[in-house]
Swiss-Prot record:
Signal peptide start-end: none
Pfam families xrefs: IF-2B
Keyword Lipid metabolism: no
Family label: Belongs to the EIF-2B alpha/beta/delta subunits family. DrdI subfamily.
Entry annotation: catalytic residues: D239 (proton donor)
Function noted in UniProt: Catalyzes the isomerization of 5-deoxy-alpha-D-ribose 1-phosphate to 5-deoxy-D-ribulose 1-phosphate, as part of a 5-deoxyribose salvage pathway that recycles this toxic radical SAM enzyme by-product to mainstream metabolites.
Identification of the protein by name: 5-deoxyribose 1-phosphate isomerase
Site positions (Transition state stabilizer): C159
NCBIfam families: eIF-2B_rel, PRK05720.1, salvage_mtnA
Organism ancestry: Bacteria, Bacillati, Bacillota, Clostridia, Moorellales
HAMAP family linked to this entry: Deoxyribose1P_isomerase, Salvage_MtnA
Gene3D superfamilies registered for this protein in UniProt: translation initiation factor eif-2b, domain 1 (1.20.120.420), Translation initiation factor eif-2b, domain 2 (3.40.50.10470)
A GO molecular-function descriptor: S-methyl-5-thioribose-1-phosphate isomerase activity
Species for this entry: Moorella thermoacetica (strain ATCC 39073 / JCM 9320)
Length: 351
């Protein structure tokens, strides 16, 4: 398998991350040293993608407590809880963020020690375990998804659910990397993904680095590409999946799903188990982040719309489960009926 660069890592006692806001123009490594700097990196999309956000948040907890002066476990847990609440306020939609924070807190709560130094090491150990497990999950998603795309010549993807959004390999792009390693190279059409252009800036960059042929299109060209028969599948990632199979992903995903249905093209969602939120019965319960209006009204620093108009800028939309052909996870491929099969597969039962 192609070995893509890791977007977030722990090296020589510090966090290293690619500043994704600067791609593709510059490849810049940043090193957040405080929880505030990590919060800023998450909020400003220097690190993005649900799995990568979870990893960053877990490492952010370590940055928050590594110099803790707590005298006992109770004091340490209080500091950890405060840091977790702070990091949770950075972005509200990606469930992996909250999952990772909760996992680290639970590991500390279960620790049979009152030694603060040992608890600090436990926080770091758990954060790095989340990172390593995510990479393994992405590999597994690649294996499961490859069988679904084996007969395709080209696929369309939206936003970036590749190596830059995870520990490595990605979710939606993992099957593409897996097939390439086997000698089958798919062509990829990448939506530019307005307003922040993650498809143009990130997906095309990493696929081009991998030697995989990629064609950039504007978001409003997807229907034409499908109508001409140029793609045989659509594959996207997810930021949150509810118990019934509704999928929150980057704004514009819902429209792509509708187009795929109209053109008889399978619409696949690739995501790890940590992206599922079984506490929510449907997509209408997912909080949707709304971002700075300037992201829509400006192109960089240049205004592209008149001042004083209304601007709507949700970061995500929700694709109803009925448009989803299958959900690819590290545990296997989930097909309808989703409410029943999601519960079974996540519990480790056969489909």
């Amino acid at each position: 398998m192609y070995e893509p660069i890791a977007p977030i890592s722990w090296r020589d006692g510090q966090v290293e991350m690619i500043d994704q806001t600067l791609l593709p123009g510059e490849l810049v490594i940043i090193r957040p040293r405080t929880v505030e700097e990590m919060w800023d990196a998450i909020k400003k999309l220097k690190v993005r993608g649900a799995p990568a956000i979870g990893i960053a948040a877990a490492l952010g907890l370590y940055l928050a407590v590594k110099d803790s002066g707590a005298r006992d476990k109770a004091g340490f847990e209080a500091e950890l809880q405060k840091a977790a609440a702070y990091l949770a306020s950075s972005r509200p939609t990606a469930v992996n963020l909250f999952w990772a924070l909760k996992r680290v807190q639970q590991a500390v709560a279960a620790a049979a020690t009152d030694d603060v130094a040992a608890l600090k090491e436990l926080v770091l150990k758990e954060a790095l375990a989340i990172r390593d497990e995510d990479e393994a999950m992405c590999r597994a998603i690649g294996e499961h998804g490859a069988s679904l795309l084996a007969d395709a010549e080209a696929v369309l993807t939206h936003c970036n659910a590749g190596t830059l959004a995870t520990a490595r390999y990605g979710t939606a792009l993992a099957p593409i990397y897996t097939l390439a390693a086997r000698g089958k190279v798919l062509k990829v059409f990448a939506d530019e993904t307005r307003p922040l252009l993650q498809g143009a800036r990130l997906t095309t960059w990493e696929l081009h680095q991998a030697g995989i042929p990629v064609t950039l299109i504007t978001d409003n060209m997807a229907a034409t590409v499908m109508a001409r028969g140029w793609v045989q599948a659509v594959i996207v990632g997810a930021d949150r999946i509810t118990a019934n199979g509704d999928v929150a992903n980057k704004i514009g995903t819902y429209g792509v799903a509708i187009l795929a249905r109209e053109h008889g093209i399978p619409f696949y969602v690739a995501a790890p188990a940590s992206t599922f939120d079984l506490s929510l019965s449907g997509g209408e319960q997912i909080p949707i982040e709304e971002r700075d209006p300037a992201e829509v009204s400006h192109f960089g620093l240049r205004p592209t719309a008149p001042e004083g108009i209304g601007i709507f800028n949700p970061a995500f939309d929700v694709t109803p489960y009925r448009y989803v052909t299958a959900i690819i996870t590290e545990k296997g491929v989930i097909r309808p009926p989703y409410k029943q099969n999601i519960a079974k597969v996540l519990a480790g039962e056969s489909r």
